[in-house]
A protein has these predicted regions:
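Catalytic cores of secreted or luminal carbohydrate-active enzymes
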Residues: 223-272
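Catalytic phosphate/nucleotide-handling subdomain of diverse soluble enzymes
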Residues: 84, 156-237
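Accessory "access/gating" subregions that flank catalytic or transport cores
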Residues: 17-38, 47-57, 66-71, 85-179
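Terminal connector regions
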Residues: 335-375
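Asparagine-centered strand-capping/turn motif at beta-strand->loop junctions
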Residues: 289-294
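Short, solvent-exposed loop/linker segments at the N-terminal edge
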Residues: 275-282
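Intrinsically disordered, low-complexity Pro/Gly/Ser/Thr-rich segments with frequent PxxP/GP/PP motifs
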Residues: 308-336
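Short, hydrophobic/aromatic beta-strand segments
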Residues: 296-303
C-alpha cells in the first residue's frame, strides 16, 4: 500500500520505490543505496499516526512505527519514530513534555546516537534559557548537510517544545525560525501540543477552528476538513483498540466501523538474514515463513532465473491445513561476466480447488567497479 499510494518523491522515498521494485523488502528496502537519506525525517514525521490510533498503548505504537519506519529508513530515523510514537500515545494521559520525553527514552537503545541526542537536548534546555544557544549546540554536535536529518531536527523539536511553554503558536514559530526541515519540526511539535490541548482549547486560546488541509498522496477523501480526518482517525483507533492483540482498550463506547478486506487463506513472507546482494560465484540464503489457514494441504515450488541455481531446503515443501512452516531458499550465482541489478524469483504454493499463493522476492546484483590510479 505504501508503494502504491506514496507519491513519486525523491530522496528516501525514491530509494524505497526502487528497492521495492527490485523485490527487496524491509528492512533492506530502507538500507540499500540509501546512505544519505536513511537517517532523515521521512519516517519520524509519520509517528503521530501510530500514537494517535493507539492512545495510552505506547509500546504497541512504538512497535508498529518501527515496522513503518524500516520501509524507507534505517537505524536512527527508525529509533526516533518509535520514540515519537511513544510520546504521542502517552500524551493522551500525560501533558508534561519533560515526563513524556523521559518515558519515551525507554524505547531508544542506550548506546544509540538518538538516545545521546535526546539526553543532550534535555540537559541543555535545563542549563540554558536562550533557545538560540541550544540550537547552536545541537548544530555543533548533530548538524548534518542533509536538512532533513532526524538527529538535528528532532533535537530542534524537543528544544522548541521544552522552551515553548505549551504555547502552540510560540512553539511553531520557534520551530520555523530554527530552520532546516521546518514542516517536520513545526508539524511534530504542533501535533503533540494539539493533542494535549484538544480542539476545544485550541479554539478558546487561539481561535483555531476547523480548517482544511492538502495532501499529495494518491487517494480520495470524503472531504478535506480536519474534523473529518480526526473523526476517521478515531474510527481507526477504535478498530485497533478492539482488535490488536495485547492492546489495552483505553476508550469506552463507540462503534467499530472499519471493515477490512478478508485475510488471505495462505500468507507467505520472506526474511533476509543476510544482505540480499550477490555477485558471481556467491550464494545467499533467504528464509520464508508460510501460514496455511485453509482446509487444504498446500505444496510449493520455486521459479528460478538465468545465471542462478536455486534450491529449497527440502525436496518437497508441504504445509498441512491450519498450520505454519518455515523453509529456506539457497540462491547460487553462477560464474558470469555480467549480472543484472534486478533479479526476481518467486515461491508459489498450490492446493486443491484452485487455491494458490505466491511470493515474489529479489536479490540485487553487486556492481563491478574499475579503479584507475593512483596518479601523481
Amino acid at each position: 500500500v505504501f508503494y502504491e499510494k506514496n507519491i513519486k518523491w525523491p530522496g528516501e522515498y525514491a530509494y524505497f520505490r526502487k528497492n521495492y521494485e527490485r523485490g527487496i523488502r524491509p528492512p533492506y528496502s530502507g538500507i540499500y543505496e540509501n546512505d544519505f537519506y536513511r537517517d532523515g525525517m521521512g519516517c519520524p514525521i509519520r509517528a503521530e499516526i501510530w500514537g494517535m490510533i493507539l492512545p495510552l498503548n505506547p509500546l504497541i505504537a512504538a512497535s508498529l512505527s518501527e515496522i513503518d519506519g524500516t520501509l524507507d529508513h534505517f537505524g536512527t530515523s527508525v529509533y526516533l519514530e518509535k520514540f515519537w510514537a511513544y510520546m504521542v500515545s502517552e500524551a493522551f494521559g500525560e501533558s508534561d513534555i519533560s515526563v513524556l520525553i523521559e518515558r519515551a527514552k525507554s524505547v531508544l537503545p542506550q548506546d544509540s546516537a538518538a538516545f545521546e541526542m535526546v539526553s543532550d537536548v534535555t540537559r541543555w534546555c535545563e542549563e540554558f534559557s536562550d533557545e538560540k544557544k541550544i540550537r547552536s549546540y545541537i548544530i555543533g554536535k548533530y548538524g548534518h548537510c542533509d536538512c532533513t536529518n532526524a538527529l538535528q531536527n528532532i533535537g530542534f523539536t524537543l528544544c522548541c517544545l521544552l522552551k515553548g511553554g505549551g504555547d502552540i503558536i510560540k512553539t511553531g514559530v520557534m520551530a520555523c525560525d530554527f530552520g532546516f526541515d521546518t514542516d517536520c519540526t513545526a508539524g511534530n511539535s504542533g501535533a503533540l501540543l494539539g493533542l494535549i490541548l484538544g480542539a476545544k482549547k485550541l479554539k478558546e486560546l487561539y481561535g483555531i477552528d476547523d480548517c482544511r488541509y492538502k495532501v499529495t498522496l494518491k487517494y480520495e477523501r470524503r472531504s478535506d476538513l480536519v474534523s473529518d480526518l480526526a473523526d476517521d482517525t478515531v474510527k481507526v483507533g477504535l478498530h485497533f483498540l478492539n482488535n490488536f492483540a495485547g492492546a489495552v482498550k483505553t476508550v469506552d463506547g463507540g462503534k467499530d466501523e472499519i471493515t477490512l478486506p478478508p485475510e488471505p487463506l495462505v500468507k507467505i513472507a520472506n526474511y533476509y538474514d543476510e544482505p540480499p546482494y550477490i555477485a558471481s560465484d556467491e550464494k545467499i540464503t533467504v528464509r520464508f515463513g508460510i501460514e496455511n489457514n485453509s482446509e487444504k494441504t498446500i505444496a510449493g515450488g520455486l521459479s528460478g532465473k538465468e545465471n542462478f541455481e536455486c534450491k529449497l531446503s527440502a525436496a518437497k515443501i508441504a504445509v498441512e491445513p491450519k498450520s505454519a512452516a518455515e523453509f529456506f531458499v539457497e540462491i547460487n550465482c553462477k560464474r558470469t561476466e555480467w549480472l543484472a541489478d534486478k533479479n526476481i524469483f518467486a515461491v508459489k504454493f498450490e492446493g486443491k480447488s484452485g487455491l494458490t499463493a505466491e511470493r515474489k522476492f529479489g536479490v540485487i546484483g553487486k556492481r563491478r567497479y574499475l579503479v584507475y590510479g593512483p596518479f601523481w
